[in-house]
Amino acid sequence: MMEKHFVGSEIGQLRSVMLHRPNLSLKRLTPSNCQELLFDDVLSVERAGEEHDIFANTLRQQGVEVLLLTDLLTQTLDVPDAKTWLLDTQISDYRLGPTFAADIRAWLADMSHRELARHLSGGLTYGEIPASIKNMVVDTHDINDFIMKPLPNHLFTRDTSCWIYNGVSINPMAKPARQRETNNLRAIYRWHPQFADGDFIKYFGDENINYDHATLEGGDVLVIGRGAVLIGMSERTTPQGIEFLAQALFKHRQAERVIAVELPKHRSCMHLDTVMTHIDIDAFSVYPEVVRPDVQCWTLTPDGHGGLKRTQENTLVHALEKALGIDQVRLITTGGDAFEAEREQWNDANNVLTLRPGVVVGYERNIWTNEKYDKAGITVLPIPGDELGRGRGGARCMSCPLERDGI
C-alpha cells in the first residue's frame, strides 16, 4: 500500500504536489535586480498567477492533491518554535546588527501569520517598517533597499526539496539568491502538522549550516524507480552534494544505485530536468546534447563499507537501460529544426510533469515538441506559459511531488 510522502518514480500515478503561486516576490523583480535574483526577465505577475491557477487546476482535474507553499508556511508559523526559529534564521544579528535585528523580529512576530509568510517569501524593505524603529542601519539605507530580499525562485518548488522513495532531501542551494528558501522548507518539514510526525527519512540538508561546495537542487534529481536515482551534475549540483545524498540513500537502503551525469555548464542546461525528463516506462524527453556519446556518466553503488563504488558508464542511455531493466529506451527529442528545437528547449519543452505513464503537463507554446510527443503516444495536457515561461521553468520545475506511485 502507498505510504504517505513516498515518491517511488518519475512516472507513477502522481497523487500530491506542492506548488507556489506567484506573489509579492515576483512583483519585486525589476530589470535592475532580476539578474541577481536569477531571472532573465520580469514577469506580468497577474498574468503569471492566472497561468499558474490553470496549471494547478489541471492537476486537480486529474485527481492530484495540490498544496500551496504559502499555506503550508502560514500554518507552520502557528507552531511557536517554528516561528521563533524562522525569525532567528531569516533576520540575522550579524547582517543587521543586534539591536535592529531584535526590533525587526519583534515587529514581525506581532504580524498575522499570513502576512509574515508573505514577507518570508516576498521580502521586506526599509520603507515598510514603522517609523518608530530607529537605528543607524535604517539611517544609512534607502526606503527601497531590502532588509530581507525577495525569494522569487520559490516558484520552482522542485529545487528546494525533493522526495526520493521514503525520504526527502532538503537541498542546500548553490546561489545566495536561493539559500534562504531552504529554511522555509526546513521549518515546514520539521513543524507543520502534516510532516512533523511523519515516518520519513531526512537524507540531507536539514541542518542550517554552511554546506560549502556540497550543493544540490531538485531539478537535477530524477527518481527513475526500481531502486535507481538519476542526478545531473550541473552548475547548481556538485559531485560533493551527489556523494552526500548517495551515501544517505544507501545507508537507509532506499536506493541501489545513483547514476550521475555531467551536464554542460551553461544557462540553458541549468538543471537536468531542463534537458531531460522521464515520461513513460521506456521513454525520456531529451534535448540531444545531454545524450551525446562523449557526455560523462557514472554509476554509484554501495562499496559494502559505508563508502561508494564508482563505475564509469559508456553512455547515459546504456546506464538507464541497465537500471530500468529495459532493452532499449525511447528518446523523444526536442521538436522542429535546429532553430526551433533550441527555442523550444529554452522555453521548457523538455521540462514536462508526468502525471502517470504517457500523460504529461507542458507548455502549449512548444508546438513542435508537443507534436512529437503526440506521435510517440504521449498525451500532453497543455497549459499557457507566456509569462510563467519567462522564469525559465516548466511544469516539472514548478512542482514538488509529495506522493507518487512507483513502477
From Swiss-Prot:
One of its GO terms (cellular component) is cytoplasm. Disulfide bonds: none annotated. Its EC number is 3.5.3.6. GO terms for molecular function: arginine deiminase activity. InterPro entries: Arg_deiminase (IPR003876). It comes from the Bacteria. GO terms for biological process: arginine catabolic process to ornithine; arginine deiminase pathway. Keywords: Arginine metabolism, Cytoplasm, Hydrolase. PANTHER family: ARGININE DEIMINASE (PTHR47271:SF2). This is Arginine deiminase. It comes from Salmonella arizonae (strain ATCC BAA-731 / CDC346-86 / RSK2980).
